[in-house]
Amino acid sequence: MVVITIFTIMTGVVLANLPQFRDKTFLDLTAQEVAITIRQAQVYGIGTKVAGNEFKSHGINLDLTADSKMLTLFADYDENNAYDSGENIEQLRINGAANFTELDTSVDSPCTPASSQCRLDIVFQRPYPEAQFKFNNGASMAGGNIKITLTSTKSTYAKEIEVWATGQIIVRTKS
């Protein structure tokens, strides 16, 4: 009888925390997938990924005002260090209870999907692993870092994907 009671209590505790566990795990995996997509753009940019018959810079475009669930991997055909229509190679769509909620740079104030314009381009030019940032279609941002916040729509969990101009990519829990 004691064993059944202990088993019932343990099962109840585990099942009560299951939705939170799933939500947190989904957010962790999605943040890692975003970081891997950024790393893929870096590898394509410094490597030998051919776009047409040439080796082009590659990058990531994130436009929160257009779609807060979409990340685009692109080849920079016109070499303007920004995503233009028709340059996409692959699109990562977040299917689930998470959204990109904020873009923050080391030089500008953060923007959100509610902002009038909230767009980021991260470009890796061959043969260098360093990242170049273009924020809100403006001038390129020299140095520093950017933070992309991914937030769960079901809870208060949030992850930050931080990309440094040196090419380092970090995923951490947002505090």
Residue ranges and their predicted role:
Residues 22-53:
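Membrane-proximal N-terminal amphipathic helix
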